[in-house]
């Protein structure tokens, strides 16, 4: 087991130690039982001594009961240790992921992280639980059984001494052959989960375009590939059982031959032969047990590599040693900023952007699809780090801020609006968990959400289903805006967050912004010119570069892109009227 993963055992160390100790006592009782059986056969039955048989029989029953007791207790402690270890490991990974930047998450993919925290950890849990019990049991059983066999027959002990390493080496060879295939299997599980996640999230789109058959075919393709990979791995592992069975029967036949010859010549008792055969079965059974655990360890080994990869991942963004812990105002400067999602050497999404947004200004951003509008604003709360240049908030490079302090003063309403399971109160309080009901209602009024919320039978106590699928797109956007406002940020960013809202409501939201939060810097990305027409400053982006900056009137005179969008939308509105 990887040392890094073992750090997650923590408070379950005691159970992890007690379980093998109980297993040792269980094995000790099991090893002594055949010796008592031999005495009953060779002395009690041979001499017809009923009293001796009863006496030794009672001892044998007591040993069996003690073995059962120790075994049950060992199983209980192993189960507690395994489940507790898995719980800690899930927590450790989950806490680690919370520190990941978008770039870190992109590296693993959402479905990949979900697979690691579910399937992979379950595999490790099973392997750990079996290891602290069965891997402790097998070596002790093999050693003690061999020692007991040595006291009964040197030839039989020598036979075991030859068989054990040969068989162990064979099993190890099989394990090494199968391991790479299991790694491929779990990598492909990510694709399988991704397919399911994508289909479930886009269920409405799939049905709207009648693409069920296509999605079924896509899922079947990934599922079939997982099946083929797993089958290949299992075909290799399947050699374990036949090899073990062959060795077991071969050893028993040789023992019967050696023992039978000894009984005929008078050098071995019948009870001793019986005990040796039982010890042989115990040894081979222990090796079969090891084989079974090896299969689990092989599967867990692939999972371990994937878990360690997450735990070893260095968060892209970390607080500096002397981090700035307060944001004075909403002044923003982009100083020769270039950015690539692939890092240095990658294709630039933003190219040499220079921009100054004064605190309290309302700034509109417009541009075609792929012009890097969202990319630009995501650099402000440091969701990504610039590739070149710097982004400054209140005159300080964002990389010098404490991340929590910076993001606490920058509220973003992303393109994809997310609501969580819970009441409307619960969702809005993501902006400030200590907010009063009155504060929640006030920000909803600003976001023009209070009206429709009060129309619900349960008002602000209305339950939102996962993803917010029981409210409309426009309602969802307004609730997300209210949530962002509750933080009382220095900077508010709306990334195309009023696209599902009618123009009248959109205008009311902007009016509320001007009147109620004049000192907050407001950055609005929009496709509708009407949403940003009255902004203090409008930025036109094209292919990751600033094509124009100015007011709406200035850009109509100087920027062809803005003029074209403006004219087409105004003309479209007139034609519609």
Located regions from the model:
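Membrane-integrated ABC transporters
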Residues: 1-30, 37, 45-60, 74-78, ...
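Alpha-helical membrane-protein architecture signal
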Residues: 2, 14-18, 90, 106, ...
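An intracellular "coupling" helix at the cytosolic face of ABC transporter transmembrane type-1 domains
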Residues: 10-14, 77, 99-103, 119-132, ...
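Transmembrane helices of ABC transporter permease
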Residues: 11, 15-28, 39, 60-63, ...
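Juxtamembrane helix-loop junctions of ABC transporter transmembrane domains
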Residues: 21-22, 29-42, 50, 54, ...
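Short intracellular "coupling" helices and adjacent cytoplasmic loop segments at the cytosolic face
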Residues: 47-48, 83, 91-115, 119-121, ...
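Helix-loop-helix
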Residues: 48-55, 144, 148-162, 232-306, ...
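ABC-type nucleotide-binding domain
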Residues: 326-577
């Amino acid at each position: 087991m990887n040392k890094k993963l073992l750090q997650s055992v923590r408070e379950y160390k005691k159970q992890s130690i007690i379980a093998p100790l109980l297993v040792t006592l269980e094995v000790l009782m099991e090893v002594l039982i055949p010796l008592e059986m031999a005495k009953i056969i060779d002395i009690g039955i041979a001499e017809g001594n009923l009293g001796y048989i009863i006496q030794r029989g009672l001892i044998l029953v007591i040993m069996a009961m003690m073995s059962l007791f120790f075994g049950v207790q060992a199983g209980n402690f192993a189960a507690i240790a395994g489940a507790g270890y898995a719980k800690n490991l899930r927590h450790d990974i989950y806490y680690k992921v919370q520190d990941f930047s978008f770039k870190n998450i992109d590296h693993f993919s959402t479905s990949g992280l979900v697979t690691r925290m579910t399937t992979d950890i379950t595999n490790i849990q099973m392997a750990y639980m079996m290891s602290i019990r069965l891997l402790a049991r097998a070596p002790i059983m093999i050693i003690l059984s061999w020692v007991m066999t040595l006291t009964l027959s040197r030839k039989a002990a020598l036979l075991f001494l030859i068989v054990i390493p040969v068989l162990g080496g064979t099993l190890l060879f099989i394990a090494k052959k199968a391991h790479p295939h299991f790694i491929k299997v779990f990598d492909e599980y990510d694709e399988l989960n991704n397919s399911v996640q994508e289909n479930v999230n886009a269920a409405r789109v799939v049905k709207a375009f009648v693409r069920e058959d296509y999605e079924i075919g896509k899922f079947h393709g990934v599922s079939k590939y997982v099946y083929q990979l797993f089958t290949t791995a299992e075909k290799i592992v399947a050699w374990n059982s036949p090899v073990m069975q062959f060795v077991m029967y071969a050893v028993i036949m040789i023992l019967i031959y050696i023992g039978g010859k000894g009984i005929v010549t008078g050098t071995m008792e019948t009870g001793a032969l019986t005990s040796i055969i039982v010890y042989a079965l115990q040894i081979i059974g222990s090796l079969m047990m090891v084989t079974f655990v090896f299969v689990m360890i092989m599967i867990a080994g692939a999972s371990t590599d994937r878990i360690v990869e997450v735990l070893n991942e260095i968060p892209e963004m970390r607080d500096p040693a002397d981090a700035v812990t307060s944001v004075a105002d909403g002044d923003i400067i982009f100083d020769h900023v270039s950015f690539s999602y692939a890092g240095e050497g990658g294709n630039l999404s933003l190219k040499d952007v220079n921009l100054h947004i004064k605190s309290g200004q309302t700034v509109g951003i417009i541009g075609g699809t792929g012009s890097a509008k969202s990319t630009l604003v995501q650099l402000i709360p440091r969701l990504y780090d610039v590739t070149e240049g710097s982004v400054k908030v209140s005159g300080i490079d964002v990389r010098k801020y404490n991340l929590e302090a910076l993001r606490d003063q920058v509220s973003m309403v992303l393109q994809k609006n997310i609501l969580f399971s819970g009441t409307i109160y619960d969702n809005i309080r993501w902006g400030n968990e200590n907010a009063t009901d009155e504060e929640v209602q006030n920000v909803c009024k600003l976001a023009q959400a209070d009206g429709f919320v009060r129309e619900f039978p349960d008002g602000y106590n209305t339950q939102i289903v996962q993803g917010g699928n029981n409210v409309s797109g426009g309602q969802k956007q307004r609730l997300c805006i209210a949530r962002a406002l509750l933080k009382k940020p220095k900077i508010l960013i709306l990334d195309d967050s009023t696209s599902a809202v009618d123009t009248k409501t959109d205008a009311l939201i902007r009016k509320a912004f001007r009147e109620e939060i004049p000192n907050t810097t407001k950055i609005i990305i929009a496709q509708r010119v009407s949403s940003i027409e009255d902004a203090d400053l409008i930025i036109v982006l094209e292919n990751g570069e600033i094509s124009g900056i100015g007011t709406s009137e200035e850009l109509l005179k100087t920027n062809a892109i803005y003029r074209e969008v403006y004219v087409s939308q105004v003309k479209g509105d007139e034609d519609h009227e």
